[in-house]
């Protein structure tokens, strides 16, 4: 978002004391970044759910784009025999550090320990109450993670949610 719209102020409200904790443990601590499949129609077949929802985004930003994005930022990726792609460093910290550096360069503000308590939509803005105060925003992007309280808040605002299934990352690999 910050890359596409540099004039927009982006604030991340993180419930926890640290960001990207699931990235840290993904792929056994190595962070399985993507899969070496370069056709969107083939890549989506490997997802046990979300095939329809992912096809459009994969046509806009695909495996090659992901590889290029990380390489432009100094993080080389490697392909393993089964097609999974990891940083050549074999540590998720390379990915985390890349994201944090990029966020800092783009002026993204990360507010830790800011658990969302209430979301309200007014005519002109969104009002988000957190454990540490109020944030008012013109636009709101919600990434709920595994927080059922947020799901309930979104439903109260009239959104329909697809029932969540616990997972860090799901990918069929034969």
Predicted segments — roles?
Residues 2-28:
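Glycine-rich FAD pyrophosphate-binding loop
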Residues 19-25, 51, 55-62, 74-85, ...:
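A short alpha-helix-loop-beta-strand transition element characteristic
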